[in-house]
């Protein structure tokens, strides 16, 4: 749970969480500050965490950075990236040729993973080449990236960051 991440993770792991899942440049300083603060007493609430990290939160971007910190902790606690990877890998096994995979992502980490997987059938690196030197990829992208229009965002503000990608499984 979040309490465990904040109060029991060592500095390198906290740094990894904030860097990998929050994409925070200040991850080393944030991790160090948390480690120092919890030596006195555990950090029990989001308000306490906010207070501990206050010196790293410039007023003009305070809410943005806090959102990234909370996002990073949530992703770690729920193992969201691992679950997404597992789902995408299973889609390869489950989908029949010409079957379609549609995925809505809500932040750049998810979208990067989905985009790379749909393009290469992998999460990192280049796809393998076949005997003739052609890339062997399991999907072809269908249409363009779909994002909500202004009207949709007015109806549902949380949709503002949503991105829908669609790919079709190729017969190999």
Regions found by a protein language model. Name each.
Residues 1-172:
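S-adenosyl-L-methionine-dependent methyltransferase catalytic core, i.e., the SAM/SAH-binding region
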